[in-house]
Amino acid sequence: MTDSALLFVAHTGNVSGAEKVLLRLVAAAVGEGRPITVACPTGPLADRLPDAVTHVELPPLGLGGESGAARVVGAGRLLGRWVRAGRILRPLMRRGGTVTIVNSLFALPAVRIGGGRSSASWLVHDTVVNGKQRAVTTIGKPAIRKAVAVSEATGDPLRAMGFPVVVAHNGVSWPVPRLGGELHSPPVVGMLALLTPWKGHRVLLDAVARLPHVELELAGGSFPGDAGYVSELEARATAPDLAGRVRFLGHVDPAAAMAGWDVVVSASVLPEAGPLNVLEAMSHGLPVVGSDHGGTSEFLAGGAGVPYPPGDPVALAAAIQRVLDDAELRSSVGDAARAYVAAHHDVNATIPAMLHALAS
C-alpha cells in the first residue's frame, strides 16, 4: 500500500496532542508523495494543513461541556452529526486505493456509517476506561480493521474488547537541549496541558497549596466548553493559600515555558494514552512527577520519572517536595528520561513507523 491515498478523519477542528500527531503524520505522508485528504471540522487543524492536502469539512463530532438535560439534548444532536458526517465520508472512503485512518474515538461512529465493516485503521489516543468511551468504541468497532495504540496501556482495554491491536509509540523532537540544573528562587513547578477537568489541575493546585515556598505555572489553552472550569481554577488560584503564586500562561512555546521550570507535573485523573507533554519534558531532562496510570506509568518506569497515586494531592505535594530537595535525584531522573526518549520516542523514527502501521 505504499502508494495508497490516505484519508484522515478527526472529530474536532481544534489542535491538542492527538491533532499534533495527525499533522506530523500528514506531513510525512505528503513527503512520500501520497494524495492526502483530511476530513475534520473547520478550525485551527484545517488551517494548519499543508497546501497539498485536501480538506473536507465535517460537523463537530464531540460532546460539548453541557450537563444535565442539555447534555441529553447534546447527545441527540451528536447522533445526527455522526449520520451527516458518515454520509460525507462515504464517497471518500469508498474510492479505490484509499486507506482511511480515524484519529479520534468520537469519529468512530461516523466512519462506521461511511465505510462499513473493516474499513479503517484507528490511531488510538484515548485509554478506554469509562462507560461513555466504551459505548462509542462499541458502536464504531465493526469499522476497524486494525487499532494502532500509542502505548501498551492503551492497547490492553482494546484487546479485551476484541480489537486487533498493534502498538506504535508517540515521539518528540530529538535531540534537544537539556534544561534544569540549579533551582530557581523560588522553585517553579509547571504543567503543560489543556485546561480541561480530566487533566487534574484541581489536584495540582491543592498540592501546591501545601508547598508555600513553591510557585506554579499552568501552560495551555482551553476550549469554549470548559470556560466554567477555567473560571473555577482562576478562583482557586486566588485563595489565600495560593494567592500570588500561580500564573496562567495560555498557549506558549513548550520549550520556552519549561526553561523556567524545575519540576514538570502530569496530574491527569484519567489515564493518558501517550502524553506528549510528558515526553517533551523528559527529552529536556526535566524531572516529571506524573499520575501512575496509563502511558505515563510506562514513560516514568525505571527511574525516568517520579510516579504518584492519581488524584492524591497530598502524595503529589510530597513527590514534588522530594524532587526539589534532592539535586542528585533530579540529575539521575533527567539522565534516565533523556536516554529513554532517545531510545524509544525520537519522532524521526516514530512517525514513519506509525504511518506504516496505519497504512499497511
Predicted regions mapped to residue ranges:
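A conserved mid-protein helix/loop that constitutes part of the nucleotide-sugar donor-binding site
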Residues: 19-24, 196-210, 229, 314
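Short hydrophobic beta-strand element within catalytic cores of glycosyltransferases
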Residues: 287-290
